[in-house]
């Protein structure tokens, strides 16, 4: 099982395990600020994605947790300051209390910004779901992760992928004994298109609602090994209660 995250080693971003690859594979360039809810989590380098759900809170994956996170909003090219960005430090990161780092069940985290973001056409929140999305629903997945299924190539600009939610039966067949009720698969069983390392924590948006968080998979864009995502619809109550009490 691989999680889509990086380690900084001697100043370089390295994906692990060693046989895995890096970013959105088989996707396309989103276009500057066309995904205004997408954020980059930065600790001196981009290491995960996230989604802005209101002016002061971001949703990401629990496996992206680390101290000293800077949230970067309004980004397109993450290696160039283009003028539309807002860089805001995290004041607290709240990992789901039932997160299991071995199974990646409950792979969700909330990040509170030290100050509220200024919302505009380039920085905007995404709505939480009011119900779960059904199999076959087309979704938009985005991130700055690896774009190769073998080898590594990290993009400067945000990449997008349109992909369908797969049936629970297809998902469980792909990963026997590993899929919980808090996960879903999305993508293409024939391979070639997938999220990858560096995309972790980022959004899966279906019909204008945040339905998924990039969580894990086996390799990237491999045949019969689709991406696995945290099922956000199961956590709306926890998200609202946590925000209200913090």
UniProtKB/Swiss-Prot annotation:
Binds 1 Ca(2+) ion per subunit. Residues 18-23 form a propeptide. It is an enzyme of class 3 (hydrolase). InterPro entries: Peptidase_S1_PA (IPR009003), Peptidase_S1_PA_chymotrypsin (IPR043504), Peptidase_S1A (IPR001314), Serine_Proteases_S1 (IPR050127), Trypsin_dom (IPR001254), TRYPSIN_HIS (IPR018114), TRYPSIN_SER (IPR033116). Disulfide bonds join 30-160, 48-64, 132-233, 139-206, 171-185, 196-220. It is found in: Secreted, Extracellular space. GO terms for molecular function: endopeptidase activity; metal ion binding; serine-type endopeptidase activity; serpin family protein binding. It catalyses: Preferential cleavage: Arg-|-Xaa, Lys-|-Xaa. The keyword Hydrolase applies. The active site is at 63 (charge relay system), 107 (charge relay system), 200 (charge relay system). PROSITE patterns: TRYPSIN_DOM, TRYPSIN_HIS, TRYPSIN_SER. Is inhibited by scorpion cyclotide trypsin inhibitor TopI1. Pfam families: Trypsin (PF00089). Residues 1-17 form the signal peptide. Substrate binds at residues 194-195, 197-198, 200. Autocatalytic cleavage after Lys-23 leads to beta-trypsin by releasing a terminal hexapeptide. Subsequent cleavage after Lys-148 leads to alpha-trypsin. Further cleavage after Lys-193 yields pseudotrypsin. A cleavage may also occur after Arg-122. Not sulfated on tyrosine residue(s). Residues 24-244 form the Peptidase S1 domain. Interacts with SERPINA1. This is Serine protease 1. The gene is PRSS1.
């Amino acid at each position: 099982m691989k999680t889509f995250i990086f380690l900084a080693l001697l100043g370089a971003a390295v994906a692990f395990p060693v046989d895995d690859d890096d970013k959105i594979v088989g996707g396309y360039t989103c276009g500057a600020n066309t995904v205004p809810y997408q954020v980059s989590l930065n600790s001196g380098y981009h290491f995960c994605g996230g989604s802005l759900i209101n002016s002061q809170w971001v949703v990401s994956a629990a496996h992206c947790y680390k101290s000293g996170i800077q949230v970067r909003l309004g980004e397109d090219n993450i290696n160039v300051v283009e003028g539309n960005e807002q860089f805001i430090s995290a004041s607290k990161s709240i990992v789901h209390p039932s997160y299991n780092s071995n199974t990646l069940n409950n792979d969700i985290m909330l990040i509170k910004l030290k100050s509220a973001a200024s919302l505009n056409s380039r920085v905007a929140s995404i709505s939480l779901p009011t119900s779960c999305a059904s199999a076959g629903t087309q979704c938009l997945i985005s991130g700055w992760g690896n774009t190769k299924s073998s080898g590594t190539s990290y993009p400067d600009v945000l990449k997008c992928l349109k992909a369908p939610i797969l049936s629970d039966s297809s998902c469980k067949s792909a990963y026997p004994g590993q899929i919980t009720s808090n996960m879903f698969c999305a993508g293409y069983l024939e391979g070639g298109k997938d999220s990858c390392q560096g995309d972790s924590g980022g959004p899966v948006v279906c019909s204008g609602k945040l339905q998924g968080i990039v969580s894990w998979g086996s390799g990237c864009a491999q045949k019969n090994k689709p991406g696995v995502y945290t099922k956000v619809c199961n956590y709306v109550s926890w998200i609202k209660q946590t925000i209200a009490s913090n």
